[in-house]
Amino acid sequence: MTVYKVPQKEFAFILDEIVGYEEHCKMPGFEDASRDVIDAILPEAAKFFEDVVAPTNYLADSQGTQLIDGVVQTAAAFDGVYQQMIDGGWCCLNGSTEYGGAGLPGVIDVASQEMLQSSNSALSLLPMLSRGVIHALNLYGSDEQKNTYLENIITGVWSGTMNLTEPQAGTDLSAVQTKATPDGDHFLISGQKIYITWGDHELAENVIHLVLARIPGAPEGNNGISL
């Protein structure tokens, strides 16, 4: 069984001596995230990732993910674990309170991410990809899109992905050929994407895909790619 111990003294040193958290939490919006509050949250996070998530690391790698009758089945070791992440609010600690998040500073979410990545790197990619979708929606999403997607993704009920890679386009995104054709208030997507991290699974109720594609008339190369 995998054994992982969170270096809590190192975390405290970083928060106090490098980040200067006592001043950091005085920033607008973080008034309720005092050092005392964080001192209560991080040990609970450590306990969860040490006791619940870390034991899945070896087991999940041994069991693997399977495609059964066209349905993706993740490792049995994950049964109930991701739901506990949702229930504990560990999927995205800095998610906006407006959309069901805890509204904590990003540095605290990073601490939680490090614990998850250290306890099970494969599972950590699930909320990591969701964070990318959350970030994109926060920056560029319409109010309708934010209201439709953010709460479920921030809480982890839904997960998100980024669809980049194609058979002929790996790290060279200028070779992306997938097309997005406008059709009323939406787009028709045509093309093939491969190697999409956590692209399909049963742990979340829904999987939201952000797709890199080209709209009609787009120039060649990276400048012609839309999200």
PLM region spans:
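Amphipathic, small/basic residue-rich leader segments at the start of a protein or domain
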Residues: 1-124, 148
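A short core secondary-structure module
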Residues: 186, 190-227
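Short, solvent-exposed loop/turn segments at the edges of secondary structure
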Residues: 131-132, 157, 173-175, 204-208, ...
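Short, well-ordered loop/turn and helix-capping segments at boundaries between secondary-structure elements
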Residues: 20-21, 118, 135-143, 155, ...
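Flexible loop/turn segments at secondary-structure boundaries
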Residues: 99-103, 132-136, 144-145, 168-172, ...
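Core alpha/beta catalytic barrel or barrel-like domain that forms the active/cofactor pocket
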Residues: 92-97, 119-134, 156-166, 226-227
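Internal maturation/activation junctions in enzymes
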Residues: 129-130, 141-185, 192
